[in-house]
Every structure is written in C-alpha cells, then in structure tokens.
C-alpha cells in the first residue's frame, strides 16, 4: 500500500502468479476500472466445457442475500459431467437429474457460485437457465471466451456464461504490461486472480 510520486506518464506493471489451482483469469485494475482481463489461453483452444456463474447481492448490509434456486436444461445436446463451484453449503441441492437437466439451490451475498458443464457436443443445442431472478435461452455456439452477462440490478447481481478449456494446466504465469498514469488522481494498481476452483486472490 505504499504511495509513490512520479513524473512519468506510464507505469510498468509486472504480475507473477503461482496458484493452488488452475487460473481462470487475471484482472488488472486501476481503482474501480478494469484495464485488462487476461486469460492464459486462446479462443482456438476452448473446448466443450461451459461455465455458468451466478453472483452479486441485493444491497450491502442485512437482507443482502440473493437466492438463485433454479435449473438448467439442454435441448439438442447432453451433459456428460457437471461439477459445482463454491458449493459450501452441502445441504443445498445440486443434482444432475438427467443427461439434459440440472437443478440446484444456492444463494450469494456478494460472492459467486455456479457449475461447469462438460457437453457431449461442442457447439450444438440451446441452454435454458431458469431462476427466480433471471431466465435465459442461450445458443451453445454463441458461448465463447468472453462472458455473456445477464444483469438483474443490485450490486453486480447477474449470471455469466462463458467457455473454458476442457483441461486447464495453467497454474503459474507471469505477465508484464505498461499502463498510462492519470495525472488528475491517485493511481491504485492491483490485480484480482480468479482460480478455476472459485477462489479469488487479491494483491
């Protein structure tokens, strides 16, 4: 948290990460602004794994709980395997009821939860997600590297859907960037690392 003064117009920013699980993404930030979202893989290497995340809260303080009880159904494709993310309350239902349907109970208070779905076909079919807050139908072929985001007010209360590697082996990496410095304010550079297992690391 040191505060430094400089007359330079740019900053050289180096990040080295050694994770306890494969790395999903690294966000490079200056204050509230995300300057870059780095992923350790390319679009061409993405596989049949779809990640569905629900997150956020109603507001800060009491009553911030957001309930995400719902289900997901596949039409024109099947689930080979489904793995929950951040399922800490084991009394909450998470069940693959058939090759085409998942049902769950979940709540968030600002963090996130969700699941990885390994599909039998990479690009076929439609994923139907139904919760009390959000209902969406998503063409599997449209799911790629960047998040498909479906908002519902509150504080970052939304569902995100994106595609992953079938097997991610990127546990450690180093990146370097140069970013311009804003002259009219303090520049607070930091990183947020998201691991595949749902854990976050902040600098």
Predicted segments with their positions:
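C-terminal functional module detector
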Residues: 1-203
């Amino acid at each position: 948290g040191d505060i430094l003064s400089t007359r330079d117009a740019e900053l050289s920013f180096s990040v080295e990460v050694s994770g306890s699980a494969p790395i999903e993404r690294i966000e490079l930030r200056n204050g509230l602004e995300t300057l870059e979202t780095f992923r350790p893989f390319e679009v061409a290497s993405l596989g049949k794994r779809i990640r569905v995340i629900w997150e956020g809260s109603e507001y800060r303080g009491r009553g911030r709980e957001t309930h995400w009880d719902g289900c997901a159904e596949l039409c024109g494709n099947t689930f080979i395997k489904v793995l929950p993310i951040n399922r800490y309350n084991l009394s909450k239902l998470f069940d693959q009821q058939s090759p085409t349907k998942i049902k769950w109970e979940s709540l968030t208070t600002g963090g996130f939860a969700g699941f990885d779905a390994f599909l039998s076909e990479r690009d076929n079919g439609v994923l139907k997600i139904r919760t009390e807050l959000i209902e969406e139908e998503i063409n599997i072929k449209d799911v790629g590297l960047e998040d498909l985001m479906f908002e519902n007010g509150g504080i970052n209360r939304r569902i995100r859907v994106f595609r992953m590697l079938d097997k991610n082996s990127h546990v450690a990496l180093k990146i370097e960037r140069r970013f311009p410095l804003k002259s009219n304010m303090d520049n607070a550079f930091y990183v947020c690392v998201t691991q595949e297992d749902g854990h976050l690391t902040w600098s």
